[in-house]
């Protein structure tokens, strides 16, 4: 199978994230990057939307999930996003990065990157 990529960069959302008491009260900014690893040849050959991974649907599902979520860690949030992408939306494999701007003093952001397949959630 080809290792083609569909990339969504800089999805900016707000959610409850963090384990400090003040972080559990107000939503904070998170920035999400997603890379869907899939074979793009069928859609490239046919130019038919039915032959591509529907990244718009996946993006909407992730938005709904994140905005309704409340996690202590960005690691758990990233894993939840990956589950939505592969289990609910059918992505063969996904890389998810979650960034929390301003989380550490003197830095722009702190983040994690994970890679998952459906087998990781069975």
What are the language-model segments listed below?
Residues 1-122:
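N-terminal, polar/charged subdomain of small-to-medium soluble alpha/beta proteins
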């Amino acid at each position: 199978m080809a290792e083609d990529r569909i990339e969504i960069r800089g999805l900016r959302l707000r959610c409850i994230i963090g384990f400090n008491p003040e972080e559990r009260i107000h939503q904070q900014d998170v920035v999400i990057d997603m890379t869907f690893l899939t074979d793009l040849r069928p859609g490239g050959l046919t130019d038919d939307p039915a032959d591509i991974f529907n990244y718009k649907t996946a993006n909407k599902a992730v938005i709904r999930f994140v905005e309704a979520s409340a996690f202590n860690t960005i690691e758990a949030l990233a894993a939840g996003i990956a589950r939505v992408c592969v289990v609910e939306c059918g992505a063969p494999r996904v890389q998810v990065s979650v960034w929390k701007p301003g989380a550490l003093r003197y830095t722009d952001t702190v983040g994690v990157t994970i890679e998952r397949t459906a087998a990781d959630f069975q």
